[in-house]
């Protein structure tokens, strides 16, 4: 009996390790982004950042009463904040604002930023905030495609200063672009971006909500805990590549990522339940459009990670 349990445990660990290996296995020396003219959209997301889904997990275990009293208030505040700042990103800025940048170019830039974040071992929240800054800037200011990479590394610099203990230096970020831009250009662009964003850096992103939703999702998924956390993070990061995901609130993207991760791991089990609905604030029917969009991204970019089922049964969204 003990041998059987050990074998089962080893299989689960191996499965989780295989999943983590997949999202890391294309690590290579980073290079400059290159020409964005007529570039196809990124082939796949190959980054796995340090999600750190539950930084207060150990503290909550030791003092559950203290933290539980704040959880609902914090969650309510974050939902209010994301609704308040919803209009800071125009979901159609490519059509209305930009004339020299396309969704495919944005996808190429974000894919490169994923690699930069991997190179410097940046936190997942740093990456998500950087992409948020890119989209907010592009929603209000026109830019030439030749300056798109400059915008990207500038937003990485800004978000790193906001989130990281030791952010990469301006020189390091210039080097990673093969010195396509000078330090003075980056510093000048930093001021331009911050002024365009009105110095508002506290915008919630999908990763902001991923922790609390994943914690609830693990309740009846403990045997697949590591897989669920890893795959949920991966799918959330895939959403960054998809311009179409801008129409959804960050909390809805996070909930959809967890929904999809649970379905991919256990397709025969309904991926949503009353606890997840209460925690996220979303019924499954509200997640359908985003889940299907993310599932398409996963099929395109995540080949080999886990063999997905052909279709998500419609009754899972009822």
Spell out what each predicted region is:
Residues 1-153, 157-318:
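Acidic, serine/threonine-rich low-complexity regulatory regions at protein termini
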């Amino acid at each position: 009996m003990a041998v059987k349990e050990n074998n089962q445990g080893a299989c689960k660990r191996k499965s989780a390790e295989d999943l983590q290996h997949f999202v890391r296995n294309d690590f290579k020396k980073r290079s400059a982004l290159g020409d964005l003219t007529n570039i196809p959209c990124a082939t796949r997301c190959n980054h796995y950042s340090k999600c750190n889904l539950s930084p207060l997990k150990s503290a909550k275990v030791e003092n559950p009463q203290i933290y539980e009293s704040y959880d609902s208030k914090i969650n309510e505040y974050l939902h209010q904040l994301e609704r308040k700042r919803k209009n800071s990103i125009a979901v159609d800025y490519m059509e209305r604002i930009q004339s020299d940048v396309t969704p495919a170019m944005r996808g190429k830039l974000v894919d490169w930023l994923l690699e930069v974040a991997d190179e410097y071992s940046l936190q997942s929240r740093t990456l998500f905030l950087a992409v948020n800054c890119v989209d907010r800037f592009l929603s209000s200011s026109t830019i030439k495609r030749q300056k798109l990479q400059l915008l990207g590394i500038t937003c990485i610099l800004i978000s790193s200063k906001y989130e990281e203990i030791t952010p990469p230096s301006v020189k390091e970020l210039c080097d990673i672009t093969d010195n396509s831009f000078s330090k003075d250009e980056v510093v000048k662009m930093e001021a331009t971006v911050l002024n365009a964003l009105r110095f508002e850096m506290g915008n919630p992103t999908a990763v902001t909500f991923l922790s609390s939703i994943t914690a609830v999702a693990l309740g009846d998924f403990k045997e697949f805990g590591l897989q669920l956390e890893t795959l949920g993070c991966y799918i959330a990061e895939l959403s960054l590549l998809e311009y179409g995901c801008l129409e959804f609130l960050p909390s809805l993207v996070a909930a959809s990522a967890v929904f999809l991760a649970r379905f991919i791991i256990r397709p025969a089990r309904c991926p949503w339940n009353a606890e997840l609905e209460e925690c996220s604030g979303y019924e499954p029917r509200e997640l359908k459009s985003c889940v299907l969009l993310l599932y398409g991204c996963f099929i395109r970019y995540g080949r080999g990670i886990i063999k997905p089922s052909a279709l998500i049964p419609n009754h899972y969204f009822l």
